Structure formats: C-alpha cells, structure tokens
Amino acid sequence: GGIIGGGSGAAAGAIIGGLIGKGKGAAIGAAIGAAVGTGTGVAIGHKMDKKAAEAAKIEGAQVEQVTDANGLPAVKVAFDAGILFGFNSSALSNDAKASLRDLAQILKDDPTTDIAIIGHTDKVGTYEANVKVSKNRAYAVENYLQSCGVSSAQFKKVEGVAYDQYDESKTAAQNRRVEVYMYASEQMIKNAEASN
C-alpha cells in the first residue's frame, strides 16, 4: 500500500466535496452548516493522517488524502487487486476479503468515522446494466465490512456510478473497483471542537 497526497493534518489532495458521478450523487460528507474552525480542522486532519497511514499498510491499498464537503481532511482507499471484480461480477475474492478485514479494523476503532462506498464498472454492456453491477459491488463491500463488525450507522452513502468516472489511463479490469471513503462524522467534528 501507499499514500498519495499524504501530508500534514490539514493538507489534503483531491477535492471530493463536489458531486460524485457527474451529478448523479451527493457530496461526500454532509455539510454541517457552520464554518469549522482551524483548530478543529487540524485535529481532524491528524486523525485522518493516522487512518491513512494505517490503511496504507493494507496489502494492495492505494490511499489518497482528499477533502470532504466541509473542507475537512478525509481518506480514500482503493485496492490494486484486492477489490477488483471479474466481468459483470460483484463477488469478493479471498484477497479482497482479507484486505477488507484489515480496513474494517480501522473503521471499528473509531465509530465517529463516517463511510461512503462508491462502486465502478468498465464500459462493456449497457449503462443500465453497469449501474446495477456497480451498486451490487458497493453493497457487497458494505455487507462484508458489516459482517466484520463495522457499525451500519457509519455507512452514509453506498452507491454505484457505473462508468461515469472511468479512468482511461487504466485497464477495463482496473476500472472494475470500489472506493471506500473515510471522513469526519458530525460527532467527530463536535468532539474536535470541544477539545479546542
């Protein structure tokens, strides 16, 4: 595994506060409606740095530090081969399950971490069929993480975006993936504000 865009607590890479799936989804992380103070952002940034470092130790994990809808640091985790799916399949491989068990431990350690899961497909077949497959992939990951003890309350968004975010620089097999986002819940934000 490895961290892409890793840095200090408040530093972040790509912005995910925008819409996922070219307008077909809501922003990652519900906006809390009030400005978050710098101290709160730094505190959450340190938590997310720790989560990113832990996730980077997972075999095959690609970890990227991103920003949520509140402008706070968040973490995106995808896998080289662990959560790649066969053609038209949402079945998790044994390697995928092993990686997800490790990720589940990170998620269980802090129940104030919210989770979004986004499923993706290649471009073979109809768009409608790919939407269904991408949703099934996201739900397969959610269900497996829950079977590993992650609280259902942590899952705030689970969706499939088919090939709306197809990466032309990758192979079709690499585009058959699921991305897991870890970001601050409203409770994590309140806890960070209270400690400042």
Model-derived segments and spans:
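Extracytoplasmic
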Residues: 58, 70-74, 78-80, 110-112, ...
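Solvent-exposed coil/turn segments that connect beta secondary-structure elements
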Residues: 60, 68, 80-82, 88-90, ...
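Short, low-complexity, glycine-enriched hydrophobic/amphipathic alpha-helices that associate
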Residues: 1-54
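Solvent-exposed, polar/charged alpha-helical surfaces in well-ordered, non-transmembrane soluble domains
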Residues: 53, 57, 94, 98-105, ...
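Amphipathic, membrane-active segments
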Residues: 47-76
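Second-shell loop/turn segments in exported
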Residues: 40-42, 84-93, 127-130
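Periplasmic OmpA-like peptidoglycan-binding domain that tethers envelope proteins to the cell wall
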Residues: 120-191
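Periplasmic peptidoglycan-binding/anchoring modules of Gram-negative envelope and division proteins
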Residues: 84-119, 146, 180, 187-195
